[in-house]
A protein has these predicted regions:
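Conserved "right-hand" nucleotidyltransferase catalytic core of DNA-directed polymerases
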Residues: 114-122, 128-299
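Active-site-proximal helix-loop-helix substrate-binding element of RNase H-like nuclease domains
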Residues: 47, 52, 57, 66-149, ...
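General alpha-helical segment detector with a strong preference for membrane-spanning helices
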Residues: 9, 55, 103, 151, ...
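Two-metal-ion RNase H-like nuclease active-site motif
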Residues: 1-8, 97-99, 284-286
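Short, well-ordered loop/turn elements at secondary-structure boundaries
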Residues: 10-11, 41-44, 90-94, 145-148, ...
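Conserved RNase H-like, two-metal-ion catalytic cores of nucleic-acid enzymes
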Residues: 1-82, 242-277
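Conserved catalytic core of nucleic-acid polymerases
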Residues: 279-280, 286-329
Length: 329
């Protein structure tokens, strides 16, 4: 497993690689041949980065293909386009990439701060219009190495996520393989379930589970039923996406639940106090293991896009892995 990070300037590029298996570091500066040798010696390894799914892998592939990394950099950073759109030739360079960046995205410096690490960034301006000096190269290498080391820390903090993905791959070797490790969990699960894109246009044909015990908050369910009837009368399901999106955003129920102001809508529920709450004594934060997946199986709510019944096996595989991880701690 190799952790890596690229830095790109107009006239220079560099990268730091840390092979945690061999316990070796590689610093490559403006040397495509050296990069090619490293890649070819480790082409079947897992390359781990922070945002490498959207950035670093395309810089690396571009250099290996003889492209200008600055052009790729500006395509992604300045023009805000997807790296894969730059060239179909990227497909000629197979890489097993695993991205540590969470979804929704959070900057590496933010997580470094949470970990109590130094979050100072390099003083070298990425917009420099000339060759870097020796001192600027050294400073950039220093901060690039720091980011790779921090990426390793973040990976270890989130290793359960990697193990879960790897566990699914091991459980379904005929459907997915190690090259899929870089996909999101949702995408890997979709492959395992054999999901295909389908259009139902019946999002308001929902029902309320009989297990609901809302008591004094029954009016929240009534509000959703009222909105359901309203949407059906408008035939909203068959309207264009813009009309749907506008209607969804306009719907909201503001109420107080357990003394906390809450906002209900079709995107979910959010609750928070206007000011922080300070309490002393015993505080319990209770979570239910696999609550949502368990509910899907219990009430037959697994996605209709699935073409097989692998979901319970995915569920049991992940549950068994979590139990092993907890026992090992």
């Amino acid at each position: 497993m190799i952790f890596y990070d690229f830095e790109v300037f107009k006239e220079d590029w560099l990268a730091v690689f840390i092979d945690v298996t061999k316990k070796k570091e590689y610093v490559i500066i403006n040397n495509p041949d050296e990069l090619k040798a490293l890649y070819e010696a480790n082409s079947k390894d897992i390359w781990v980065g922070y945002n490498n799914r959207h950035y670093d892998q395309y810089i690396m592939k571009g250099i290996l293909l003889g492209m200008n990394p600055k052009r790729i950099n500006d395509w992604i950073i300045v023009e805000k386009k997807e790296g894969w759109q730059f060239s179909s030739a990227f497909n000629k360079v197979p890489m097993i990439n695993y991205d540590v960046m969470p979804n929704p995205p959070v900057g590496l410096k933010t997580l470094e701060g949470f970990l109590g690490s130094n979050i100072k960034e390099t003083d070298v301006d990425f917009r420099i219009n000339r060759k870097l000096t020796k001192e600027e190269i050294e400073m950039t290498v220093f901060y690039c190495r720091h980011d790779v080391e921090e990426t390793i820390k973040v990976f270890l903090e989130k290793i359960d996520e990697f193990n879960a993905m790897h566990g699914i791959i091991q459980a379904f070797p005929d459907i997915v393989n190690l090259s899929d490790i870089g996909d999101s969990e949702a995408r890997i699960t979709a492959k395992v379930l054999g999901c295909s894109r389908r259009s139902f246009e019946d999002e308001f044909d929902f029902y309320f589970l009989p297990c609901l015990q809302l008591k004094k908050y029954k009016y929240v369910q009534d509000w959703f039923e009222q909105k359901r009837q309203e949407a059906l009368s408008m035939d909203l399901a068959h309207m264009d996406k813009y009309s749907k999106r506008t209607w969804y955003k306009e719907q909201g129920l503001e109420t107080v639940v357990a003394g906390i102001p809450h906002s209900f809508g079709f995107g979910g529920v959010h609750g928070a106090t206007a000011t922080p709450i300070h309490k002393t004594g015993q505080l319990l934060h209770v979570d239910v293991n696999n609550y949502y997946p368990s509910m899907l199986i219990a009430w037959g709510l697994v996605t209709r896009a699935a073409t097989n019944d692998n979901y319970p096996l995915v569920y049991n595989t992940r549950k068994a892995m979590k139990e092993k991880q907890i026992a090992a701690k």
